[in-house]
Each structure stands twice: as C-alpha cells, then as structure tokens.
Amino acid sequence: MKAVFAILFLAFIALTYAKSYDEVKEEIKNEVEREIFEDLEEESDELDNYVEESNDAKPWRRWRRAVRRIRWRKVVPYIPAIVRAAGKK
C-alpha cells in the first residue's frame, strides 16, 4: 500500500510541475525558429565569404585562402612520396 501511495504522490508532483501542452508547443516552435535563424546566419556568412573571394582584386589573397582550405591531414601522408618523386627527376 505504501508503494501505491508513493507512486501516486510522485505522479501528483510530476503533474504539478509539468508544463502545459501549449507551453511545450511554444517552446518547440521557438527552438525550431532559433535553429533556422542560426542556419540562415551561417549561409549568409558563407555567401559573404564567396563574395569577398570573387571580388578580391589581390590574387595572392585568393591563393592564400585556397592553401588554407586544403585538408592537410589528408595530404600530409603523401608529401614524402611527392618529395621522393620530385628528387628523382
């Protein structure tokens, strides 16, 4: 009998502190809107970077950006083979 009262008491506490359906729906809506705005900001930043690259009058800056974008972790293992091949010529 004590277990039943304990379960009912915990259920009562849970229902007391539970949010209403409308509050939960509003919170989910706000979270989705926040994620959409974050995605739009990221896309806007990417577009701004692309505009900078295409309008850049200094070619060395474009070259430097291209070098920075290289995924060095994938390239590094091949560097010794490239050096050996270049040294044989």
UniProtKB/Swiss-Prot annotation:
This is Arminin 375. It comes from Hydra oligactis. Belongs to the arminin family. GO terms for cellular component: extracellular region. Antimicrobial peptide with a broad-spectrum antimicrobial activity. Keeps its antibacterial activity under a wide range of salt concentrations that mimic physiological conditions of human blood, which is surprising, since Hydra is an obligate freshwater animal with nearly no salt tolerance. Does not affect red blood cells. Residues 19-57 form a propeptide. It is found in: Secreted; Target cell membrane. Its main location: secreted. Residues 1-18 form the signal peptide. The modification Alanine amide is found at residue 86. Keywords: Amidation, Antibiotic, Antimicrobial, Immunity, Innate immunity, Membrane, Secreted, Signal, Target cell membrane, Target membrane.
